[in-house]
Amino acid sequence: MSKAMALRRLMKEYKELTENGPDGITAGPSNEDDFFTWDCLIQGPDGTPFEGGLYPATLKFPSDYPLGPPTLKFECEFFHPNVYKDGTVCISILHAPGDDPNMYESSSERWSPVQSVEKILLSVMSMLAEPNDESGANIDACKMWREDREEYCRVVRRLARKTLGL
């Protein structure tokens, strides 16, 4: 797939997101000269310790998008079992097709060209509400999520306030 085809697809997805985007999510190209890097703002889901937080993130698309998945990285301090310490999100929908060596994911959960930016961002919001501690990216967050949920929620709420400058 050519970079021009990827660009057309990204422009179409951006138009759909601006016209019909889900609540709690804003996303679009970082600048009009580069449609392959998007700035996102994800609102913490209600009823979770992330509630009230506004989380900036960056989506980076490969030149063969949608054949290859993008990467998503939070650009603020973030504590979650499925987010690496550098902010990179680790969820099935962002994993390239193929076999999962750890046997945690079925191929139907992984990236395919029918996925979209909207589906990715909705999956991230779902991940915030329901972490997968079986295939953790942040071992400390996994351990705290399993063993001391109250402390985990306290840490996440503190970081949520920090996203608001409080």
Curated annotation (Swiss-Prot):
UBC core domain ranges (all copies): 5-165
Processing and modification events after translation: Autoubiquitinated at Cys-90; undergoes 'Lys-48'-linked polyubiquitination, which leads to proteasome-dependent protein degradation.
Enzyme class per UniProt: transferase
Keywords: ATP-binding, Nucleotide-binding, Thioester bond, Transferase, Ubl conjugation, Ubl conjugation pathway
Active site: 90
GO cellular component: cytosol; endoplasmic reticulum; nucleus; ubiquitin ligase complex
Pathway noted in the entry: Protein modification; protein ubiquitination
One GO molecular-function entry: ubiquitin conjugating enzyme activity
Cross-link position per record: Glycyl cysteine thioester (Cys-Gly) (interchain with G-Cter in ubiquitin): 90
EC number in record: 2.3.2.23
Catalytic activity: S-ubiquitinyl-[E1 ubiquitin-activating enzyme]-L-cysteine + [E2 ubiquitin-conjugating enzyme]-L-cysteine = [E1 ubiquitin-activating enzyme]-L-cysteine + S-ubiquitinyl-[E2 ubiquitin-conjugating enzyme]-L-cysteine
GO BP: ERAD pathway; inner nuclear membrane-associated protein degradation pathway; protein polyubiquitination; ubiquitin-dependent protein catabolic process
Top-level division of the source organism's lineage: Eukaryota
Function: Catalyzes the covalent attachment of ubiquitin to other proteins. Functions in degradation of misfolded or regulated proteins localized in the endoplasmic reticulum (ER) lumen or membrane via the ubiquitin-proteasome system.
PANTHER family assigned: UBIQUITIN-CONJUGATING ENZYME E2 (PTHR24067)
Family: Belongs to the ubiquitin-conjugating enzyme family.
This protein's name: Ubiquitin-conjugating enzyme E2-18 kDa
